[in-house]
Curated annotation (Swiss-Prot):
Domain of life, per lineage: Bacteria
The name this protein goes by in its record: 1-deoxy-D-xylulose-5-phosphate synthase
Family: Belongs to the transketolase family. DXPS subfamily.
Keywords, sorted A to Z: Isoprene biosynthesis, Magnesium, Metal-binding, Thiamine biosynthesis, Thiamine pyrophosphate, Transferase
SUPFAM superfamilies named among the record's database cross-references: Thiamin diphosphate-binding fold (THDP-binding) (SSF52518), TK C-terminal domain-like (SSF52922)
Assembly mode: Homodimer.
Required co-factors: Mg(2+); thiamine diphosphate
Source organism per UniProt: Serratia proteamaculans (strain 568)
Stored Gene3D superfamilies: 3.40.50.920, 3.40.50.970
Function description: Catalyzes the acyloin condensation reaction between C atoms 2 and 3 of pyruvate and glyceraldehyde 3-phosphate to yield 1-deoxy-D-xylulose-5-phosphate (DXP).
BP GO annotations: 1-deoxy-D-xylulose 5-phosphate biosynthetic process; isopentenyl diphosphate biosynthetic process, methylerythritol 4-phosphate pathway; terpenoid biosynthetic process; thiamine biosynthetic process
Binding site for thiamine diphosphate: 80, 121-123, 153-154, 181, 288, 370
Pfam families assigned to the protein according to its UniProt record, in alphabetical order: DXP_synthase_N, Transket_pyr, Transketolase_C
Amino acid sequence: MSLDIAKYPTLALAENPDELRSLPKESLPKLCDELRQYLLDSVSRSSGHFASGLGTVELTVALHYVYQTPFDHLVWDVGHQAYPHKILTGRRDKIATIRQKNGLHPFPWRAESEYDVLSVGHSSTSISAGLGMAVAAAREGKNRRTVCVIGDGAITAGMAFEAMNHAGDIDPDMLVVLNDNEMSISENVGALNNHLAQLLSGKLYSTLREGGKKVLSGLPPIKELVKRTEEHLKGMVVPGTLFEELGFNYIGPVDGHDVQGLVATLKNMRDLKGPQLLHIMTKKGRGYAPAEKDPISFHAVPKFDPASGTLPKSAGGLPTYSKVFGDWLCETAAKDSSLMAITPAMREGSGMVQFSRDYPQQYFDVAIAEQHAVTFAAGLAIGGYKPVVAIYSTFLQRAYDQLIHDVAIQKLPVMFAIDRGGIVGADGQTHQGAFDLSFMRCIPTMVIMTPSDENECRQMLYTGYHYNEGPSAVRYPRGNGTGAPLEPLNSLPIGKGVVRREGEKLAILNFGTLLPEAAQVAETLNATLVDMRFVKPLDEQLILELAASHDALVTLEENAIMGGAGSGVNELLMARRRVVPVLNIGLPDFFVSQGSQEEVRSDLGLDAAGIQRQIEVWLAQ
């Protein structure tokens, strides 16, 4: 489903950056208008990340206009904002396939285009990678430039500051563009500041600045005085003292929606020596009023009617697991003021909006800082509170050392509510929750629970919250529950599974929300079905009894087979010298690509038909 490019005559002339750079500078505002409209028309018909891209149209055009991409390296952080980049780099006609099975990748992806020099999806990686590229480019000696684009949210993460601190030390030739969309374009970001930015980025000022530093460095008695005076004077016009202290030459803030001004500033900055930081001010959702008004709702959108300006409401029906968690949080906080809920910038996605409003003193959004979130929770636990860390499976990977060193070793009662466990779908390889059971299962003192429905999820949240012997985790998927009735909250017996169906010869040991599919297969094959509930500790007694009374066992989980729950069953049986055939069904040993959850599960044989087929093929061997 491609759009009629004739409706976008200037954009039609810029199929790739080479064509873009052949356009006269005067045509760039018109190009930006058409690019923004093309983005609106395509995403509204197909779904995808939306508001961020609207805010980076002018920046994207200016960067490709000034820099010789793909020879020069352009690195996008996270990648939500890179749809205009994809449109301008030969992928315009495929943009409607983004995030779909066999379509364009949702983020910049090295295997997709030579213009995507770094595959991304998680935040705050761009400056570290860009620094490495800049060092490599310097040794190459071909005058290749490196530009990193990072947002005001992503730059708050520790990794970004670690990279800037290193860059300030080794002094590479690179540019970091800080895309700041937290503030609107106000009076202090107008003609004066744009003129100032072009002046400060010019060769004359740069030469005087560097020459002055060399002269002043030879005058010890006045060096510090001059340094402080320079900082004071510069602080009056630009808010860049922090970046200057890290060793960057700071330029800005400038209007990120003035494409011709950006081109002029970037041309000045391209040949500057040392690490540079350009601070631009943009508006998320720029050019589409509903997205400007509510950029959070329009961050990632389903298909919608742009004329109405409203997003389709969900059909209601079954609650999501995220909502089940959020409701449990509110219910628990109403009775227990010691509950402290923590999220690393995922309030909406984790179902915590209502909690944050009703219990603001018990709610902490620590920004994109997963490592800090976990150790902060450890401190709260030491202080006698009951911390709950709400975090996506894929982002918990970023805090693994803190989970071990700061929580588990000290046996602190921190509960992890792990959302998006298993297949998440359209965001692809970087966001699938494929590894959490594997990387948590090897940690001593951890209790790991995998609910099979929303009622089980509530009971496990209650169980983990009241477990005081160490850390616990409840791991649940993206999507809706099953409609299971919600029972009064009670603690489950730790490490005990439940037999859901008695069968013969074959026993299926289920971990998590594939239980309905497993139930269909068990009925067809007359197999015993067990909801194991706990990945750790395993119900060893039940497993050994099943091994003794059945000819074969099947483990089922939506996690990597390697190191997962099924591996734990294998280890137990081998340790006890129980020789029984075991089939482990789960995620294979490759990074799972994008597609709807249903498509991915079908492709991997994790729907009912696929599970049955895998079992029958295995039994026939």
